């Protein structure tokens, strides 16, 4: 057992260590898929990101980083989420060559649990345009759920108690838990790709509306095929709810209702199987204690790596 004087401080925040490990560990999958220009660009960008993160972490540790550098280190795990999500098909192909999707297995599991296929039936059972638009709006709120709760903590606007802002554990813990939730989902997508019901037709009777059309446009522009199980939408929403209850309790009911609508909308809109949503709840819930265990392991001395409030 180490005393505080014997404990070695980590070289970077846990979130940065985890990000570097993920980038380095999955890099071979980009190389294994062949030497196409897109893969080479993605691999070069990944190598560059690792070196940049290591450089920023080194400057942070030496206390010579600037204000913008601190912000980059604080937010890098969430800033890189869209890029990491977008490259998932390349990782899937690097692992298996021709990607084999596991939708038949998930559909069988779905039927064994529910005795039906909710993703194809819920909209026809409750064909309300108002309900449809509400659930699709909740589904679209996923993007705000990723960034708004951490931002409020970062600005010191919502955390209870006297210690607010970037110097608190609340921001670090929230970012790390969300990051763990994402990375668990991403690894599941790579090793067990599932397309989701959206690729097998529109749910019968689903009402049309501007919000649904917006969601469809977002998915068409930015979704990665094979990234359905578990639902990262539901996983991240669940993680954010748990962290909001812990650190921003005034937002708890709002985030709970949005998350509930998001999970229902994922199935109602035909974007996910119901078991995708259930698996997302499980991942999102387990991500919180897993993130805590990682931080205790990698930051045993409990240093404060996030930026102090105010300019450098």
Residue ranges and their predicted role:
Residues 148-155, 234-252, 282-293:
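Membrane-interfacial alpha-helical segments at the cytosolic side of multi-pass membrane proteins
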Residues 20-30, 83-87, 182-189, 259-268:
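Aromatic-anchored segments of alpha-helical transmembrane domains
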Residues 196-200, 228, 261-287:
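Interfacial helix-loop-helix junctions of multi-pass membrane proteins
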Residues 73-77, 147-191:
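Interfacial segments of alpha-helical transmembrane regions
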Residues 131-145, 224-245, 274, 278:
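Membrane-interface loop-to-helix entry segments
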Residues 87-104, 108, 181-206:
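Transmembrane alpha-helix/helix-exit interface in multi-pass inner-membrane proteins
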Residues 2-48, 64-147, 309:
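N-terminal transmembrane-helix/juxtamembrane module of multi-pass inner/ER membrane proteins
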């Amino acid at each position: 057992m180490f005393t505080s004087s014997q404990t070695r401080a980590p070289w970077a925040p846990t979130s940065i260590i985890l990000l570097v490990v993920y980038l380095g560990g999955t890099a071979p999958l980009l190389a294994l898929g062949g030497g196409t220009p897109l893969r080479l660009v993605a691999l070069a960008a990944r190598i560059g990101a690792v070196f940049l993160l290591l450089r920023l972490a080194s400057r942070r540790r030496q206390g010579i980083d600037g204000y913008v550098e601190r912000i980059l280190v604080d937010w890098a795990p969430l800033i890189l989420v869209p890029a990491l999500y977008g490259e998932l098909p390349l990782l899937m192909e690097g692992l298996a060559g021709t990607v084999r999707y596991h939708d038949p297995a998930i559909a069988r599991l779905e039927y064994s649990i529910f005795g039906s296929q909710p993703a194809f039936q819920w909209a026809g059972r409750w064909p309300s345009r108002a309900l449809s638009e509400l659930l699709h709006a909740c589904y679209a709120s996923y993007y705000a759920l990723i960034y708004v709760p951490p931002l409020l903590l970062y600005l010191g606007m919502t955390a209870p108690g006297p210690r607010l802002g970037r110097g608190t554990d609340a921001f670090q813990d929230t970012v790390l838990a969300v990051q763990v939730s994402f990375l668990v989902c991403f690894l599941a997508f790579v090793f067990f790709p599932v397309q989701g019901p959206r690729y097998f037709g529109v749910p019968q009777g689903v009402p049309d509306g501007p919000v649904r059309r917006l969601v469809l446009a977002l998915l068409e522009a930015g979704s990665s095929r094979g990234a359905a199980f578990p639902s990262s939408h539901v996983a991240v929403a669940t993680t954010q709810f748990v962290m909001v209850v812990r650190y921003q309790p005034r937002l708890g009911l709002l985030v709970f209702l949005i998350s509930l609508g998001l999970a229902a909308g994922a199935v109602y809109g035909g974007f996910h199987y119901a078991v995708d949503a259930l698996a997302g709840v499980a991942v999102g819930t387990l991500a919180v204690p897993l993130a805590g265990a990682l931080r205790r392991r990698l930051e045993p001395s409990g240093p404060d790596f996030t930026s102090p409030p105010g300019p450098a």
